[in-house]
Amino acid sequence: MVRSDIRSYLTIAKRELCEAPTSWLAFSALLAWMFGLYWSDLFVFRLTTTSFEFLELRALWLAVEAVALLVLYFGLLRVLKHSSGVAVVAGTFLFVGSILVLFAPSGFAFDGMRIVGVVLTGLGGAALLALLGIRYARKGPKLLLVNVALALFVAALFDSILLYLPLDLQLMIVALLPVVCVALYVASARNNAVAEGLIDGSTSTEAVEVFTTNSTKINIIRIVALPLIVGLAYGLMQRLTSDAYTSGAAGVNTATIVSFFLSSVFIALAALFIDSRKLIKLVCFAAIPTVGIAFVMLPLFSDAREAAQAICIIGFNSFYFMVWALWAGDRAEPSLPKRFVLGLFVLVGAESLGSVLGVPVVAALDDSGSTLAVVSLVVVYLLLMAGIFSFDRSGTVDQEQQAVVGAELSGQIAMGDRDLDIWVQRYGLSARETEVFELLAKGRNRVFISKALFISDNTTRTHMKNIYRKLDVHSQ
């Protein structure tokens, strides 16, 4: 099964790389823009006003994004109906805001213009982030992580080239990245129009009601509790490593880019193991310790906070996008976009709040290594508990998803053999998998299928897992 999983994963990655590049390239452009404006020290001098420092303006940007996401949540139906138009408006906000931030003259008289630019980038960034995230979530957890990994890798590669360009060219490129992002998104929307049409309405109302009733508590954990903890810890990390941006160290940008590269590797591994319980081990024994080591060792990084920040970014990026994958795993389609935007609101809002709360924390530390270590241990403990509690209950939701999909497939196949042929052709099932698939849709269990088809239990299990993987339904 390991070889089969790897082959399936490589096939998916190759298909996304060759057949749907505009989708992840759009996100890559957005990530590269974020790095240029808010995640590097390239333009710190332009993101500083008389009254506000760089990190305070970045916290404002995150807060505006959170407010915009909350507004999107209540008007999401209209937004999705006119997604391309909304993307163009959001890209315009992002472009104009970037121009104001990067090219506004220095001085107190122009501080208001720069703050308006930050607000506009928050409004535009939130809309594009939500639209891209929802599109990936509709593809399922594995495809979401594959797209994110590709986008992170390309963004890191692009940013590494950006570092060596002249300052004026850097400013121009970063300002134009929102235009590139929107153009790629609109092109991707046209390419995916048919596919998204097939997805819309694919889950019956009864199935949605059963799903949302049985998994309310788990949804609260995944959409509210876990993003809240991750966001707060992320914002606090930014404050604790604030010296990385203000010390003028040449290595901060390189460290951030390397962390983006490594994050793409971690997320690609998560996509490989998303169908099994190994994902829990990957989160609990890779991402959490990575963040933990960075937090606990922060006192030792007093002269090299950029190194601690890079380690934290690797762990938190793994958390950040695995939380996205959890939301994508809840496949009750009518409520998926709203759940995603709500979770994103909590995540971004908590990150902004963590950055604000980090101000008194940093002031109280007063270079006290022991106090910093205590704060670090508390954060790591909360992340560990939240991660284990959330991921360890993923099996319950997966079983509910299989029941929902099974009920829906039963209704589809009951219409006739022609409908079965459509499902088989759409998902590329083999002849034996088709036989197993038909019995599964009729509600038969593994034992019955083994006896009916005269095959071993292990063979039946293998066929079932292959079917679940092709249909993007996750079985334990």
Question: Which residue ranges define each predicted feature?
Answer:
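Transmembrane alpha-helix termini and helix-breaking/packing motifs in multi-pass membrane transporters
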Residues: L72-L77, A155-I173, A268-L272, L353-S370
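Helix-turn-helix DNA-binding segment
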Residues: A407-K465, R469-K470
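Intracellular loop-helix junctions on the cytosolic face of multi-pass helical membrane proteins
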Residues: M1-A13, K142-L143, A156-L236, A271-K278
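Linker/hinge segments immediately adjacent to helix-turn-helix/homeobox DNA-binding domains
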Residues: R3-S4, A32, G36-R46, V67, ...
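Intracellular juxtamembrane helix-capping segments at the cytosolic ends
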Residues: G125-K139, S318-E333
